[in-house]
UniProtKB/Swiss-Prot annotation:
Transmembrane segments: none
Lineage: superkingdom: Viruses
GO cellular component, one term: host cell nucleus
Full protein name: Nuclear phosphoprotein UL3 homolog
Localisation per UniProt entry: Host nucleus
Any Pfam family hit: Herpes_UL3
Amino acid sequence: MFSELPPSVPTALLQWGWGLHRGPCSIPNFKQVASQHSVQTDFTENSVDANENFPIGHAGCIEKTKDDYVPFDTLFMVSSIDELGRRQLTDTIRRSLIMNACEITVACTKTAAFSGRGVSRQKHVTLSKNKFNPSSHKSLQMFVLCQKTHAPRVRNLLYESIRARRPRRYYTRSTDGKSRPLVPVFVYEFTALDRVLLHKENTLTDQPINTENSGHGRTRT
């Protein structure tokens, strides 16, 4: 127990040499600050000329024109845990976007899986004696970029691809050691204040459709 109460925060700051002043705080306007630091991405008549080149990235990089880049302001994150059909699900989503949204520009990442034990070594040994050996939990994360005007269409395509999964082919390991079908897949939607520019090479435009894993055979995840 303390013999006396600890000093207050202002008192401690004064002892450390910080100066304190009374008065209103100057809190900047968020919208004003955002407009001052935002990057102009609307390609209007006042933007850079179409024939003018501008450097991208560090010095020494190849100069690109603005026509080589596409602005995005909406991001979807597809997330799931212990989804055994991770690669097949993301391939299905990518194939659906290429086939059903060919007239709009969309970009997406490949399957990103992260695994972790989630139990200590001592607890893992104890559970092993009870004939239940929990394996690592694998997390699926896939990101899809589009423009806000195309967000409803992309959202519907994502929902359709997720609902089209076959229950007999997707299972997860629950806490009781049994396998259960249809792992829940979550879709999160984010909207940016400023648009993000991506090169056209990173979009799904005119990309070949991978039909290697579209059959009923087993896919390695």
